Amino acid sequence: MSVPVQHPMYIDGQFVTWRGDAWIDVVNPATEAVISRIPDGQAEDARKAIDAAERAQPEWEALPAIERASWLRKISAGIRERASEISALIVEEGGKIQQLAEVEVAFTADYIDYMAEWARRYEGEIIQSDRPGENILLFKRALGVTTGILPWNFPFFLIARKMAPALLTGNTIVIKPSEFTPNNAIAFAKIVDEIGLPRGVFNLVLGRGETGGQELA
């Protein structure tokens, strides 16, 4: 019998080997077979990811929006290259039919491209003041570090739904997928790593909501 793969987290631009003893089994809902294991991540793991995102954020925000958008397009291209692999993961761990999984992957790539197009529309405003001869200039600033705690039902698309607007507008992010459907998120992190996204901009922690998720919240 083959041993299920044990997945690492992705923090500060690298896959981090889990030093703890507790693992969570990821189960195929159709066969009830254990298909992988993920770390039972704790609050300190989430805090490390938040700290990495915080360190990376000022330099990321300093990039022009159009340059941040170019990174998003690299991610969407990577998704399209690995679409078959990712859709198979969604079917295996989430129990979706193949067609629905394929649509989710394609829509995810399209959504990231859509958000990248907003780089040319991400502008400030000039507002007329209540006083004569005066205008108000409005500059948009990033919030800083954002987090995304994901459900299991549309696991892959919701990574993009949280990440793409955050990164485009100069924020960094920490994502925690559902412990029931984490394998597709690992595939997403591999794409981020392969394209060389600046370290700390995207982080992935694994575990349960009441531990790592609580820290992110």
Regions found by a protein language model. Give the residues of each.
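Terminal low-complexity tails and localization/encapsulation signals of metabolic enzymes
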Residues: M1-I38, S70, K74, G124-T147
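Glycine-rich, flexible loop/turn motifs
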Residues: V5-H7, I11-D12, A22-W23, V34, ...
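Histidine- and aromatic-rich ligand-binding microenvironments
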Residues: Y10-I11, D25-N28, V34-R47, G196-V201, ...
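Alpha-helix N-cap/helix-start motif
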Residues: R19, A46, A83, A101, ...
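Conserved beta-strand positions that form and line the central face of beta-propeller blades
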Residues: D25, R37, L89, L100, ...
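Glycine-rich loop-to-alpha-helix module at the N-terminal edge of alpha/beta enzyme cores
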Residues: A33-Y122, G133
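Rossmann-like NAD(P) dinucleotide-binding subdomain of oxidoreductase/dehydrogenase enzymes
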Residues: G124-A217
